[in-house]
Design a protein with these regions (language model features):
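Nucleotide phosphate-binding site architecture
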Residues: 99, 162, 170
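Ligand-binding loop in jelly-roll beta-barrel domains
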Residues: 145-167
Length: 222
């Protein structure tokens, strides 16, 4: 596969080029790219085309902490309050990558709304479907061990999540030995799942080989 490229075009604009398998894919690829960059810009606090976003409000963060994070990690009220200032509400578009395999996550991600599919890639490049994570689940656990994640994750629909950076979630987990033990077990289970030989469902080979056709878009990011 050919990775997309980007270059500054002046005037706070950027030109992004995406390799296509066929010119017929132009419209669909452009629509997907613009949708994904809309979500990505808001996650990073960028003002795409001058737009402002206040999705991660204190009220939303507090609600997500109370209804999802606290039950998942069995947090006390004190722990919840200590994490709220360091948590951020984010959204991902359908089919967008939420977690990359082989990278060390910088945060734990708790699913508030929507679902994601965990995947792993075999030596021959085939993508294998692993488990489905739904509301109330979490990913990015290997941020605590500073190890690369064995699995990738992509959104099956619009996903709303709460992210808590490693240094802040780590402080809470290390104070709770039973929680640390349970999270360690989950990490081990997911690693076993991603390396299981069996006969899992495959969702493709090495992927389509792009041709020289390129899609270009020029988002304005401030």
């Amino acid at each position: 596969d050919v990775a997309p490229t980007s270059a500054a075009a002046g005037g706070r604009e950027y030109r992004v080029s995406i390799a296509l398998k066929s010119p017929a894919d132009d419209s669909a690829a452009r629509a997907t790219f613009l949708r994904w960059i809309w979500y990505a810009a808001r996650r990073e606090g960028l003002h795409l085309n001058g737009a402002y976003d206040d999705f991660s409000t204190p009220a939303r963060v507090q609600m997500a902490m109370r209804t999802v994070v606290a039950p998942a990690l069995r947090l006390s009220l004190t722990d919840q309050q200590s994490l709220i200032p360091h948590a951020k509400m984010v959204r991902y578009g359908t089919d967008e990558v939420v977690q990359y395999a082989g990278e060390v996550p910088t945060a734990m991600t708790f699913l508030i709304r929507g679902s994601v599919r965990l995947t792993t890639t075999t030596e021959d490049g085939s993508v294998i479907l692993l488990s489905l994570l739904e509301e109330g689940s979490f990913l990015g656990l290997t941020t605590l061990t500073r190890q690369p994640s064995n699995s990738g994750a992509y959104a099956l629909e619009e996903v709303t999540a709460l992210e808590i950076a490693r240094e802040h979630i780590e402080d809470v987990v290390l104070r709770t030995p039973l929680l640390l033990q349970e999270l360690g077990r989950i990490i081990e289970d997911r690693q076993k799942e991603s390396s299981r030989t069996g006969h899992p469902e495959r969702v493709g080979g090495q992927g389509p080989q792009p041709n020289p056709g390129l899609l270009s878009a020029r988002p304005n990011v401030k």
